[in-house]
Design a protein with these regions (language model features):
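Two-component/phosphorelay signaling modules centered on CheY-like receiver
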Residues: 17-42
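Short amphipathic alpha-helix used as the core "switch/output" element in two-component signaling
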Residues: 75-86
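Acidic, metal-coordinating helix/loop segments flanking the phosphotransfer/catalytic sites
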Residues: 36-62
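Hydrophobic/aromatic residues positioned on beta-strands within the core alpha/beta folds
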Residues: 93-95
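Acidic catalytic/metal-coordinating carboxylates
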Residues: 39, 73-76
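Active-site residues of response regulator receiver
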Residues: 66
Length: 147
């Protein structure tokens, strides 16, 4: 029996329907499990006080967020997730108007930055580099499917 590998999973946050649709289609065609949200407030992981994922499991392989969104800024959301113990190691922030302060803050918490308008090949380079390091037999948390 052939063992099916776990598909890569990405969470996408952007208030622009066009950007979400573009990224959803791109990752979906690559075989990813894709969850996209117009802002962090509508994602179940943002409402938990601590990381709800079981020990050793991450909610996703990648989190890609816009900087400027209604309700909560992407950098605030990602920083909060890191403080709560989020186990997703690969997080990136996109914006067309990063300030020097945004750049310094994002880099200080280990975020990859993509300046809009970005080329999809920039994101492809980032994910392909990381895909090579991800164990295909890893398990991902699925607690938020039950919410």
């Amino acid at each position: 029996m052939i063992k099916k590998k776990t598909p890569y999973r990405i969470l996408i946050f952007d208030d622009s329907e066009g950007i979400r649709s573009l990224l959803y289609g791109f990752f979906n065609k690559r075989g990813y499990e894709v969850f996209s949200f117009p802002n962090p407030a509508v994602c179940p992981i943002s409402h938990e006080k601590t990381c709800p994922c079981p020990t050793g499991l991450a909610c996703s392989d990648f989190i890609l967020s816009d900087l400027n969104m209604p309700v909560q800024q992407g950098i605030d959301f990602l920083e909060k997730q890191k403080r709560k113990g989020c186990k997703c190691k690969n997080m990136a922030l996109m914006s067309g108007d990063f300030t020097e302060s945004d750049i310094v803050r994002a880099k200080s918490i280990g975020l990859v930055l993509f300046r809009k308008p970005f080329s999809i090949t920039e994101i492809l380079d980032w994910i392909e580099r990381i895909e090579k390091t991800i164990d295909p037999d890893r398990k991902l948390a699925d607690w938020f499917f039950e919410k």
